[in-house]
Amino acid sequence: GIAQRPPASCSSAPGAFFRPCCVDMVEKAFIDANALLLDSYRLARKIFDDGYRPDYVVGVWRGGCPIGVAVEEFLRVQQCPIKHHTAIKTQSYTGIGQSREVEVFGLEYIVSKVDAEDKVLIIDDVFDSGKTVKAILEAVRGMARRNTPEMRVACVYFKPTANQVGIVPHYWLHETEAWLVFPHELEGLTLEEIGQKLDPEIAQIIQAPGGPFARAAEA
């Protein structure tokens, strides 16, 4: 989804596999890679137990894609008749009047396949403002028209107080207000944070000669 902005106040989600770290008075919750995979399967189980059987599974690039892969794998081994799985991309930009707008890319494949009787599961890592999901739903409706499928939204993390659109995901696991740092994320972190909160080996790997992390280590 769209990159998170540091919240005004934060608290870790109950039961979430976090390694919290407060930096500049903002709590960063570092999410363990294996815990995220397990949560992806838990999310899939929640969807399956609810009786929902999607025909299409759509991951939102970037964070929703690894979760979407796990969810799709789970549903397939449960013999759900999934027709297609794919990824779409969203991008935030400043529109007229300086409001933040969301553009959606890559919907052509799904829209060319779906019928009104189909079920589409849209998966992202975190639902915060909700603007990303709202833009996706509106874009599908605008392109598919009479063939608009039933669409449901699933995510691992939900930030209810950040919601700006009045819609909520159909499925989620954890509610949180923390600034989430996913296992693949490095940008915006210090070398110390990467070494202590992610993995010391990652901190060593990213110190490429001449790069900013190598210079930081030498300082």
Where do the model's predicted regions map?
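PRPP-associated nucleotide enzymes
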Residues: 1-219
